[in-house]
Amino acid sequence: MSTIQIRRSDDSDVVSAANDYHSNMAIQEITVAELHEILPNIVLVDVRETDEYVSGHVPGAVSIPLSTVQDNIEPFLAHKPTYVICLGGARSYRACEFAEQNGAECINIAGGTGAWIQSGFDVVLGELPNS
């Protein structure tokens, strides 16, 4: 009877592979100060919900709530790169991950609209999405 030897990787191999995968999938980010410098010459998508968008958004931002990104991927694909913002950076990061998995090139805005407002930059109030 023959025996089969199974080699088990130690945990460091698994952690290293996971880190390599994550670093290859990392989403690019810029600060709100960097965003301020390049506006209005970019496409900026705000993935907050409509009521959040209407309560104050970065001038020129287009509203595509995160809950609808899957059905509205075209704007992400039409412009390379597409800049994506939310309130703090987490939802926009998720939107970027989804869009990039579908062929888009996205840049997340670190700190989001909250950091934009804290920096004292102008916001647009009360405007309907995409108007």
Model-derived features: where do they sit?
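Short, surface-exposed ligand- or partner-binding patches at beta-edge/loop junctions that are enriched
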Residues: V84-I85
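Rhodanese-like catalytic fold shared by cysteine-dependent sulfurtransferases
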Residues: S2-V43, E49-P81, R91-S131
